Amino acid sequence: MLKLLENMDVIVSAVPYEFNLTLTELAIKSKTSMVDLGGHTNIVRQQLSKNQEAISAGVTIVPDCGMGPGMNITMAVLATEILDKTDEIYICDGGLP
């Protein structure tokens, strides 16, 4: 996984929250910025405790940005910046149990 991340600028983690701390550590080690959907306060606190390591590695880690609202809106904004013209955006969110 580390070798794969070393070739990326940023990763978006949409996996179950149990993996986010490990992904944070790998992102810092590979000098790859990361954003995730979050889902568990204790995991997020552990990720935030790695802030100085991330700064030293020159990367940004954004934990717990959420799925909706959150990542879905961020991706919609990105799409409007890429497209020549946007009249409307419809966002559907399947939700998680």
What residues fall within each predicted segment?
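Short, well-ordered alpha-helical microsegments
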Residues: 1, 19-21, 44
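Alpha-helical segments flanking ligand/cofactor-binding loops in enzyme cores
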Residues: 3, 24-25, 52
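N-terminal Rossmann-like NAD(P) cofactor-binding module of classical short-chain dehydrogenase/reductase
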Residues: 5-14, 34-35
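Structural motif
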Residues: 14-15, 37, 64, 92
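ADP-ribose/adenylate-binding Rossmann-like module
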Residues: 16, 26-45
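Short glycine-rich anion-binding loops that position phosphate/pyrophosphate groups of nucleotides
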Residues: 17-18, 67
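Rossmann-fold NAD(P)-binding glycine/threonine-rich loop
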Residues: 37-63
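Rossmann-like dinucleotide-binding core of oxidoreductases
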Residues: 58-97
